[in-house]
Amino acid sequence: MKSPLLHLAAALAALVPALSSAQTIVDEWPNVKAPAAPTLKPVSVDPKTTALLMLDFVPPTCGARPRCLASLPAMTKLLEQARTHGMTVAHSVTGTTKAEDILKDVAPRAGEPVVQSSIDKFRNTDLEKILKDKGIQTVIVTGTSANGAVLNTATAAALRGMKVVLPVDGISASDTYTEQYVAWHMVNAPAVAPSTTLTKTELLKF
């Protein structure tokens, strides 16, 4: 009679081929169906408690991405609307770029803060203090790249208790799939989705 340990060993040995042939998500990739597109919603914001974040509109990032350059007319209009309504506007740069490198169409005006960081614009900057000092409760996050500065800064804002408005015509990446997955992630991720609203610039009301 075989001992219980031998029976267990035999059972485990039988499982090895099954485990080795189990498919990973990468193996299943071609068969995964994309989720339905998220809904873009109209948004009304209070200019007194809302800030517009213009992230990394500089040549090395925006200039290298045709989709970012294509977003500039909408971003220029949104920026002017924010300024007209007295909204707080903050800009960011990355790498070795400086405030004066920000593209002319969306360049900061005197008094508009510019922070320099990597993909999370709250990290090692005074952005959080700037927003808190002005009583900001909602941020409109725009810029490039969608999967870099936008995703990480928007997430950081949500985790700090702010509401996040994400106009999809104001975020850009090197390809459309990247923009798509960022939009999906922001309205499905735990702790972030409840604070995030997807919209487009023409649905924003001040």
Language-model regions, residue ranges each:
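Bacterial N-terminal signal peptides that target proteins for export
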Residues: 1-9
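N-terminal signal peptide c-region/cleavage motif recognized by signal peptidases
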Residues: 17-21
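Active-site-adjacent betaalpha module
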Residues: 23-51, 97-206
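Short hydrophobic beta-strand that contains or immediately precedes a catalytic carboxylate
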Residues: 53-55
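A cross-domain feature marking catalytic cores of carbohydrate-active enzymes
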Residues: 57, 91-94, 168
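Short acidic, Gly/Ser-rich segments with clustered Asp/Glu that frequently serve as metal-coordination loops
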Residues: 58-63
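…and closely analogous acidic/polar surface helices at protein-protein or active-site interfaces
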Residues: 65-82
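Von Willebrand factor
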Residues: 79-97
